[in-house]
Regions:
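Catalytic-site beta-strand/loop segments enriched in glycine and acidic/polar residues
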Residues: 40-76
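Structural motif
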Residues: 33-39
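Short, hinge-like loop/turn segments at secondary-structure boundaries
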Residues: 18-21, 43-44, 97-104
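A cross-family acyltransferase "interaction/gating" segment
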Residues: 66-125
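Cofactor-binding loop segments of dinucleotide-utilizing enzymes, especially the Rossmann-like FAD-
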Residues: 5-7, 56, 85-88
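Catalytic core of membrane glycerolipid acyltransferases/transacylases, capturing the structured
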Residues: 1-33, 76, 91-92
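Membrane-interfacial terminal anchoring regions of lipid-handling membrane enzymes
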Residues: 46, 130-164
């Protein structure tokens, strides 16, 4: 399950994700659309389905984690697992969006980096939830810093070499 905006840009991304076999949960900035998508995502997580959310939301700013991901984790009882994918390869489909969203094109080599799970106590205060939100941001920043070096390490192992 991937939560994606109901915007025009989101429609393109949703179609790609569905073609790749992902279930898409659509939400909009308005309270009703956002609440419906949030409740649907919480329900999916409570039924042990996976969920993915771009933590900077549909309108940014880029790399600033919104509080919605913390609320979803808190209400579902599931941890937040920071994920960052990286490739220096320029062959990406680039979208003219505020966050410069990119989708890998054809045989792009990329790596996924995963951070430690971040748990949210259901009894947290608003201040504690804010600390969790900041922790998510910091974890993603750290993965982004590590990505170029980790990519080089993976590439050195020859994982993507063509078999003869």
């Amino acid at each position: 399950n991937i939560m994606i905006s109901r915007s025009r840009d989101g429609e393109i991304i949703a179609k790609v994700c569905e073609k790749w076999g992902f279930k898409v949960v659509r939400g909009s900035k308005g309270k009703k659309g956002s609440a419906e998508a949030t409740l649907q995502m919480i329900n999916e997580l409570k039924h042990d389905n996976y969920g993915a959310i771009m933590v900077d939301g549909p309108h940014g700013p880029a790399k600033v984690c919104k509080d919605g991901v913390v609320k979803i984790a808190k209400l579902s009882g599931k941890p937040i697992v920071p994920v960052f994918w990286y490739s220096p390869n320029p062959t990406f489909l680039k979208f003219p969006t505020w966050d410069k969203f990119r989708i890998p094109f054809f045989s792009t080599h990329l790596i996924n980096l995963y951070g430690e799970p971040i748990y949210v106590d259901k009894n947290n205060t608003d201040e504690q939830d804010e600390q969790v939100r900041l922790k998510v941001e910091k974890a993603l920043e750290e993965l982004e810093k590590q990505a170029p070096q980790r990519y080089k390490e993976v590439f050195r192992f020859g994982i993507w070499k063509k078999k003869k």
